[in-house]
Curated annotation (Swiss-Prot):
Family classification: Belongs to the PdaD family.
GO biological process terms, semicolon-separated: arginine catabolic process
The protein, known as: Pyruvoyl-dependent arginine decarboxylase
Annotated Pfam families: PvlArgDC
Amino acid sequence: MIPKKAFVVKGTGVHKDKLASFELALRDAGIEKFNLVTVSSILPPNCSIVSRKEGLEELAPGQIVYCVMAKNQTNEPERMIAAAIGNAVPVDSNDYGYISEHHSFGEDERTAGIYAEDLAATMLATTLGIEFDADSAWGERERVYKASGHIFDTVHYCRCVKGDENGLWTTVVVSMVFVL
């Protein structure tokens, strides 16, 4: 049971009830009609990243669907929340990659997204035995990772919003959804 395809979705939901807010975020992302099972952070070998449209066309309502999901929620007015996933893909498509989840408060979209991307790349780099200075800035580590010849690409996806001004529950989700 190894996924051959994956796609990314993002959503936001606002409601007086926390669970309903999450449901609305899933609807906004287009994945509310599936039975979602969250899994850990491995991008399978030979797994193609496809468009949301292409991925959704291969799934049926009620289907059990595996995903890596970043989620954050608040009912504090104007509180900044972010959910992000980072993706690190190795040069050799027969090797596995990493997907990281990051959930934060007070970070803007760029900061949260870069953190998630850095985390995925660092996890992949450590499994490949790439030597690097863990205290160096992300840009420097990114150059080292890519210069090693092992890491082909890194990317991040993020949803960042301020909590509802009236204190309604606000939820953000970002998910890498797998197609078997």
